[in-house]
């Protein structure tokens, strides 16, 4: 599908020259599609409003900031550089419901996702998505256990 729309595939050099916010822009959309697909696969008979609320738990800036902090140790050198470029790029938009630090971390995360997507690194993208989903599921289980012990 990408090849049809892009014509030519992007090279690493092309992406190094691209504004990191452009990579984050596409990364935001790619990440959301992955997460929505995951949420739907686990909640087939749920109304759209509830699906949206579950999706927000993954896509809000503080969640993305948490995920990138946790998975950073699994990123290779190139991905770390891409992340830092995205995180450190000055943006004209501001965080609505997040700290500046979380917003920048989330932008770095989305930059990595966009970079991998435009390079057609689908296997690597899936590995990162699995790490994120596993982190979410672990934190949800821990939250449930903590709530259970309070009563």
From Swiss-Prot:
**Keyword DNA damage: yes or no?**
no
The terms under GO molecular function for this entry are: ribonuclease III activity; rRNA binding
List of catalytic residues: 28
* Required cofactor(s): Mg(2+)
Broadest EC class?
A: hydrolase
- InterPro entries per the UniProt record, alphabetical: Mini3_fam, RNase_III_dom, RNase_III_sf
Q: What is one term from the GO cellular component aspect held by the record?
A: cytoplasm
Q: Which GO terms describe its biological process?
A: rRNA processing
Record's signal peptide: none
Annotated Pfam families: Ribonuclease_3 (PF00636)
**Which cysteines in this chain are paired by disulphide bridges?**
none
Report the SUPFAM superfamilies cross-referenced here. Answer: RNase III domain-like
Localized where?
A: Cytoplasm
Q: What EC number(s) does this enzyme carry?
A: 3.1.26.-
- Give UniProt keywords alphabetically: Cytoplasm, Endonuclease, Hydrolase, Magnesium, Nuclease, Ribosome biogenesis, RNA-binding, rRNA processing, rRNA-binding
Q: Which family does it belong to?
A: Belongs to the MrnC RNase family.
Q: What quaternary arrangement does the UniProt entry report? A: Homodimer.
**Record's function text:** Involved in correct processing of both the 5' and 3' ends of 23S rRNA precursor. Processes 30S rRNA precursor transcript even in absence of ribonuclease 3 (Rnc); Rnc processes 30S rRNA into smaller rRNA precursors.
Protein's UniProt name? Mini-ribonuclease 3
- Origin species, per record, is Clostridium tetani (strain Massachusetts / E88)
């Amino acid at each position: 599908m990408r090849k049809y729309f892009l014509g030519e595939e992007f090279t690493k050099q092309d992406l190094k020259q691209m504004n990191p916010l452009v990579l984050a822009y596409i990364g935001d959309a790619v990440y959301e599609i992955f997460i929505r697909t995951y949420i739907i696969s686990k909640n087939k008979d749920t109304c759209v409003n509830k699906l949206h609320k579950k999706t927000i738990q993954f896509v809000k800036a503080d969640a993305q900031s948490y995920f990138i902090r946790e998975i950073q140790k699994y990123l290779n050198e190139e991905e770390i550089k891409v992340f830092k470029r995205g995180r450190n790029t000055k943006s004209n938009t501001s965080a609505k419901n997040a700290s500046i630090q979380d917003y920048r971390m989330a932008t770095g995360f989305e930059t990595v996702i966009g970079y991998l997507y435009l390079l057609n690194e689908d296997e690597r993208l899936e590995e990162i998505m699995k790490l994120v989903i596993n982190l979410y599921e672990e934190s949800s289980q821990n939250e449930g256990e903590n709530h259970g012990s309070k009563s």
